[in-house]
């Protein structure tokens, strides 16, 4: 399970090359079969065991690749979900949302996002797209400012528009993905069981977290950029899906936008976008000494809170002593501005908040009490200090064609189904001004042409 050309493995500064002679998965190597999730788990267990006699606390980071593409998983997980997803995107997504409501994960009256509209061909780009004279709409320049250009957009077909062959291939992609998730769960179980076996489980803080929303690339008809769904439904290709068959398409197979919308349910948009489906991720925490499940934490938290939380668990106070000025004689810029002193080095301070108070129940309410935002690929969002409002910018054609910032009332519409910016001009105006002020203060520069990694 290794995407072509986009990953590397090192141990103690030495490259590990899976599949090569003498290397994991290669001739004469150990293990004989390399699957990253299995390999990482066993390596991490060996690291824990190598130092367990020193009596010191340990920090272990299991940075799994799975279930990121390529869609590959070994037996017995490869065929475990055969036929489970034949009902298609809508049926599976609706069933998941119903179960979320039944479990109390979302309110019974939660209004989910229905998915992006179908266009089976590229949404047209503006005439100047790709030319030197193009003036692309971005988060600071809208159509009202004279900027009107954007590139083409593509959206996957709905299930009802797929041919029988396309449905066959699409269902198989999700079967493989589900197998990858269960294999990941199995390996996490091995880690937890090992902690129990060595008597450390009850004394260990464990956090499981995804790094982003569901992966929806490529936003195009068909989920494999090197082969069509129709071709993937034919033998011998179909039977080889999910295996490392040595072909380039095996190294790039993914499940596409529509299954990503299923994974992101009940939220809007996917990885790379600032909609709730792109920025909301599952997190599960086990506290030292915890013996039973605790209530679900519903406060807004951010990945930057993790470091502050880990330090709090270890009883370490984050560094706060301001660093002395270090002015560049050529530019006049203080290179230590905003930094603090740590171990005689000048570093940026920990910006997150410890989650221990809310996790243990000693504090309630919002973790972040100031406006909080994020940005990727020029796609930005900002939450209001009270957590109610969310200003969001997405480039056309998936965002508004005039380039305006959208506004959602998260208190009643976390599914982001209704843009209420026109009804609340002062709210959206304040949030956008706050975002622009922050960008100006930190020297943030918007890309001239916002677009994602795809």
Please tell me what each predicted stretch does.
Residues 1-82, 87, 95, 101, ...:
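Formylglycine-dependent
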Residues 1-12, 20, 61-63, 70-80, ...:
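Short, solvent-exposed loop/turn and secondary-structure capping segments
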Residues 44, 58-64, 177, 181-184, ...:
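Beta-strand elements within well-structured catalytic alpha/beta cores of enzymes
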Residues 53-60, 200-206, 366-368, 384-389:
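Loop/turn elements at helix/coil->beta-strand transitions in domains of secreted/extracellular proteins
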Residues 56-58, 106, 110-144, 183-224, ...:
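Metal-dependent active-site segment of extracytoplasmic phospho-/sulfohydrolases and closely related
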Residues 72-73, 193-286:
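Histidine-centered active-site microenvironments of extracellular/periplasmic hydrolases
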Residues 112-152, 161-167, 396-405, 410-454:
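Long, internal low-complexity/basic segments
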Residues 249-278, 290-410, 442:
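C-terminal cap/loop subdomain of S1 sulfatases and analogous C-terminal strand-loop tails that border
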């Amino acid at each position: 399970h290794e995407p072509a050309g986009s990953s590397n493995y090192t141990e103690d500064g030495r490259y590990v090359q899976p599949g090569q002679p003498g290397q994991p998965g290669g001739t004469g190597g150990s293990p004989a079969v390399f699957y990253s999730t299995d390999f990482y788990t066993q390596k991490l267990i060996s690291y824990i065991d190598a130092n367990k006699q020193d009596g010191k606390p340990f920090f272990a980071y299991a940075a799994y690749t799975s279930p990121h593409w390529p869609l590959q998983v070994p037996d017995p997980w490869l065929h475990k979900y055969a036929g489970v997803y034949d009902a298609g995107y809508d049926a599976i997504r609706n069933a998941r949302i119903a179960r979320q409501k039944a479990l109390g994960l979302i309110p019974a009256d939660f209004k989910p996002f229905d998915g992006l509209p179908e266009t089976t061909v590229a949404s047209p780009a503006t005439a100047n797209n790709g030319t030197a004279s193009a003036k692309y709409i971005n988060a600071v320049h809208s159509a009202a400012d004279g900027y009107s250009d954007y590139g083409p957009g593509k959206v996957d077909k709905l299930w009802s528009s797929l041919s029988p062959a396309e449905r066959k291939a699409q269902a198989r992609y999700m079967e493989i993905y589900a197998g990858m998730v269960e294999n990941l769960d199995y390996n996490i179980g091995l880690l937890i069981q090992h902690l129990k076996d060595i008597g450390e489980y009850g004394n260990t803080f464990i956090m499981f977290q995804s790094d982003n929303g569901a992966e929806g690339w490529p936003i195009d008809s068909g989920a494999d950029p090197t082969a069509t769904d129709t071709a993937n439904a034919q033998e011998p290709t179909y039977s080889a899906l999910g295996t490392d068959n040595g072909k380039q398409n095996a190294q790039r197979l993914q499940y596409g936008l529509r299954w990503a919308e299923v994974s992101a349910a009940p939220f809007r948009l996917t990885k790379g976008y600032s909609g709730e489906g792109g920025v909301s991720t599952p997190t599960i925490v086990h506290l030292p000494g915890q013996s039973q499940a605790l209530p679900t934490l519903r406060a807004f938290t951010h990945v930057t809170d993790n470091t502050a939380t880990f330090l709090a668990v270890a009883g370490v106070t984050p560094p706060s002593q301001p660093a002395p000025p270090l002015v560049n004689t050529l530019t006049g810029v203080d290179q230590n501005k905003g930094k603090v002193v740590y171990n005689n080095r000048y570093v940026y301070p920990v910006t997150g908040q410890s989650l221990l108070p809310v996790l243990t129940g000693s504090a309630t309410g919002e973790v972040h009490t100031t406006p909080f935002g994020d940005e990727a690929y020029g796609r930005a969002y900002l939450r209001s200090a009270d957590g109610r409002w969310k200003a969001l910018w997405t480039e056309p054609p998936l965002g508004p064609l005039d380039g305006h910032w959208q506004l959602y009332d998260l208190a009643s519409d976390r599914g982001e189904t209704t843009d209420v910016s026109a009804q609340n001009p002062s709210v959206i105006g304040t949030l956008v001004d706050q975002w622009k002020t922050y960008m100006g203060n930190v020297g943030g520069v918007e890309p001239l042409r916002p677009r994602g990694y795809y």
